[in-house]
Amino acid sequence: QTMKRKLVLPKMRISSPEEFLLLYPFAREVFADGIERSIQRAKNKKKQRKTYSGKKKQHTRKSVIVSDNHRRILIVTKAKSGRRHDKRLADKESVFENLPQDVEVFADTAFTGEQRVHSKTYIPQKKPRGRELTASEKEMNRIISSFRVVVEHAIGGIKRYRCISDKLRNRKAFIDDKFLLLSSGLWNYHLSFT
């Protein structure tokens, strides 16, 4: 209740660009990234396959986080199985479709292809097969990464809270979403005093 009154809780879903502008009128740049948190391994083999993340080599749940340039978390998607890709999760939740076209989005290479949905999306260029990146492409990647570090700091701020950084053993439905939402709200509340 208190965090809701202080307007520090991020939104789980934005339904239109107008709603985004109404909630965050001063956000001109946003930064998107995925967050993975480890969970307890299921006993059932099918459930194990569903939650196993090849990237982290453990069983995880995954969400997409959108923050502004002040490290404040604006949007947190629902947690899905760790096997899913960041882009697929963002597409399912319509994260990029519901951002206004005049807002610049900085993301990592996991979101390649989102430029078709949102025109002002800046993503580092991958090295093409068989050749190297040019010096100007490398410099552009460095610039994009220097902007993107903001969302990494925001994720680090969320992971200060042990309910996010430790392995989740609670099997109640949607408890991981609540933990992530509350940790994001506490991080935003902390930022309002610094």
Model-derived segments and spans:
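Short, well-ordered secondary-structure "scaffold" segments embedded in the functional core
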Residues: Q1, L7-T194
